[in-house]
């Protein structure tokens, strides 16, 4: 868990840096997971496949229609500006990120997913898997 938090911290503060690029490069070597595998992960039936450190977070979201563009945009995103804008839209009732997926840029959804996972979940990876699965199903 400490390793995951360190990784998330690096992403938030060093986007575009060597660390963020390392995360993206690491994800290239991890196979995509099927819908059934994501469901199994969410239900906690399989964890042994996810000991790959930096690639772990990426692989949950890089699935079927959730393409590499999703990850690339997220790695290039100005996290704090986007998060502020997203919060403003949610607070004013103009947006619900998972319900308004067709009108939302994938990068905004990634920011929302990351914040939700870190803030409201004891298991951020499972939370990200659930959100990733919802996005895949809505596409």
What are these regions (language model features)?
Residues 2-10, 14:
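Sec-dependent signal peptide recognition
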Residues 14-20:
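Sec/Tat signal peptide C-region and signal peptidase I cleavage site
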Residues 20-139:
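Flexible loop/hinge segments at secondary-structure junctions
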């Amino acid at each position: 868990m400490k390793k995951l938090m360190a990784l998330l911290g690096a992403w938030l503060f060093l986007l575009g840096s060597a660390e963020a690029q390392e995360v993206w490069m690491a994800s290239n070597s991890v196979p995509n997971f099927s819908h059934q595998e994501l469901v199994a992960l969410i239900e906690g039936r399989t964890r042994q496949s996810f000991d790959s450190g930096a690639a772990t977070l990426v692989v949950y979201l890089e699935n079927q229609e959730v393409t590499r563009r999703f990850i690339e945009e997220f790695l290039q995103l100005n996290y704090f500006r986007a998060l502020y804008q997203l919060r403003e839209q949610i607070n004013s009732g103009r947006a619900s990120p998972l319900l308004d997926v067709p009108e939302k840029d994938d990068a905004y959804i990634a920011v929302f997913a990351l914040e939700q996972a870190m803030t409201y979940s004891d298991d951020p990876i499972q939370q990200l898997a659930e959100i990733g699965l919802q996005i895949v199903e809505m596409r």
